[in-house]
């Protein structure tokens, strides 16, 4: 099984980085193949230019995007790891989705509507948030945070989302809660590998 980690946090010593390391630990332990796309480390350009939109119609992709698409094609399971910024994903990850999950690669148009082209792939989303769970639920933000990436992007492209784990109050919780989150993530990855 091939595992692709799409990591969108600018800090190497963040809790998001600990999540990434926990996934890598499990994947290595089970002798699985994995690749990491650290969007900040590779200085990914998130800006979708108009000429790219035109090129997508002819399935013409710039070399950097074609490379990222090859990573998606290679993967059986994709992990998205990112912090919540303004109740959404960081702009660098949104730009990654805008540019990489392009028309002709990730989805196409049919007389019956859009059709996803990435069926058979699975995704896990691990998202940290500074806000409390109660606050997210009271303001209906939790559902909107899930809808955008899970339904509006990944499922639209045919990818099955197996879990979207939002970890709230990430800056206020104690170390033992961080460790509990990491254990839960390791179990999730292990269960996926053992399927």
Task: Give residue ranges: language-model regions.
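Hydrophobic residues at beta-strand termini and immediately following loops
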Residues: 37, 126, 164-167
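A generic structural signal for alpha->beta connector loops
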Residues: 31-33, 120, 158-161
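Generic secondary-structure boundary/loop-capping signal
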Residues: 41-44, 102-104, 115, 151, ...
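Glycine-rich phosphate/pyrophosphate-binding loop and the adjoining helix
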Residues: 136-195
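Short, glycine-/small-residue-rich phosphate/pyrophosphate-handling segment
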Residues: 108-156
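N-terminal beta1-alpha1-beta2 submodule of the flavodoxin-like/Rossmannoid cofactor-binding fold
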Residues: 1-105, 169-195
